[in-house]
């Protein structure tokens, strides 16, 4: 029997607790949800909230959607003088039309949930540059730029010009809302050739040398440069990410480098972490976000100590950016998309090609810990949006009917809204969890399946959609298998954040799998099956729409 949990609007009236291998896991407010998730953040006084302004049918309720066109890479996240968190992303408002090209679009937030549109901050095709691509900003609070006030914000970005990928600079005097060309509209760095990969500058200040540092994506390496004035840059090394440094398997084209530090309170150790976008095609994966643990030399060069690891194991967490919240915590937001199919032929309900698509991920909270002799970055989803219409059930394979395949037992089959929080606690009735547990998210135009092997610590994710056609469809519907190394346990916990066009899966031990699902259906069916004598305790709640 399914039980409805009576809740009031904007409040959560219950908390379901399970003890898993010594960790307290909460279905609402879990280790995968920030502890503040039960607070009433829906009373935010943000104005002009536009989380649901995508009008082509692909809008999401619980994620930020671009107001028009096509969005991709997330740019620097910084805290402004107005006490808001500001970020930019690449927007092509003329997607698949004339005057095609990206520019920096500006949004801000106070709670990492509700976002306010502020408009285009760095426009394309002006001031000597062409389309505006990825980069980062530097707040001049220490007066490094002597010709600019300490309140200035300086943006460095790549522009794809007719002669190659060049780095430009611009400055803002109004908290990042508008930018003016710096260095007389001339590039501060130029690619040596039209073909050279030379982009996505990440700038930061090196306290040891009193120089400004720049990390650049250069094909299979991250180039490292320094400057005493922010205009003239000197090469001082590189972090190689080719096959010879990665045990024979490269990571394809490197993009969007970033650098953050993490302190592990257990070992009392601080490490620097190089974050970047790459292609895991040689590792049974696709493009995604990666990290590498290491340290900095005094001159600002990054030195790797471990091999790269996948930050988010899903297909659609790319062009991510990061905010250093504290020595132990970094927040991250990614673009929910993939260059292999996001620009393919995606269809609206009327059969016409969609020219308006794109959303951001939920915020990830990152921390570092030591496991099996090496340091790993763990992620948890932050979702403080209000929950309503709770549903709780506990089912056992012993008393459940046989699934249509004649083999699995159907533990749960329920119709819900597409924007949904799903907490699943699995246990075996006699011993450790065994066999396969399958979770299906079904919409009229989209299906996603997650097949968890509780004995081997692996899971496989498959999806299909009638909204995508052509070659991109084959790439979109390719299945991927992932190791989560969580096997032979008495308890197995899976937490899912579903929305109309996305699914984020939090596995035990801090692993997240994010994916885009192309759908315009506002409803879905949730099905949970088991191949053996497992039981499940499940809680499902509607996420309240972020818009007013």
What are these regions (language model features)?
Residues 1-17:
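Bacterial Sec-dependent N-terminal signal peptides
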Residues 8, 20-23, 531:
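Compositionally biased, intrinsically disordered low-complexity segments
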Residues 13-28:
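Classical Sec-dependent N-terminal signal peptides that target proteins to the secretory pathway
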Residues 25-41:
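Sec-dependent signal peptide cleavage junction
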Residues 38-548:
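Carbohydrate-active catalytic/glycan-binding domains of CAZyme proteins
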